[in-house]
Design a protein with these regions (language model features):
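Binding-site signature for planar aromatic cofactors or substrates
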Residues: 1-122
Length: 122
């Protein structure tokens, strides 16, 4: 389960989101306005393309997050798990209803089930 402290950090900051393509090539993007629901991270997809394509071949993903004041005291975590992309249903409806997404055309919800959390050392 994702702790309350990590949940706050995740929901208040941009995250790096890494996927792996068909030929094993890594791809990393920044995502924001994500939500933590239990042991899952829910990402709203308004513009994500290559990462979605990569998930068709490999569902293993990694996210990284750190605090905004990292230059004073760096606190960060890597969150690894498996991702699924939803273009309809409960998770799609959930992200479409989020106030942060008002005015955006949401294409899908990416739901990452977190299997491992690692504290990053600075």
């Amino acid at each position: 389960m994702i702790s309350i402290g990590i949940k706050k950090l995740v929901e208040a900051n941009a995250l790096g989101f890494a996927t792996i393509g068909k030929k094993g090539k890594p791809h990393n993007i920044a995502v924001a306005y994500v939500k933590v629901v239990g042991d899952q991270i829910v990402i709203s997809n308004a513009h994500i393309k290559e990462s979605i394509s990569n998930l068709k071949y490999n569902k293993n993903v990694s996210l990284v997050v750190w605090n905004k004041d990292y230059d004073k005291a760096c606190i960060g975590f890597e969150l690894a798990g498996t991702a699924s992309n939803y273009t309809e249903g409960k998770w799609y409806d959930y992200v479409c209803s989020l106030p942060d997404n008002e005015g955006y055309k949401i294409n899908s919800a990416i739901v990452v089930k977190i299997l491992k959390i690692k504290k990053l050392l600075s």
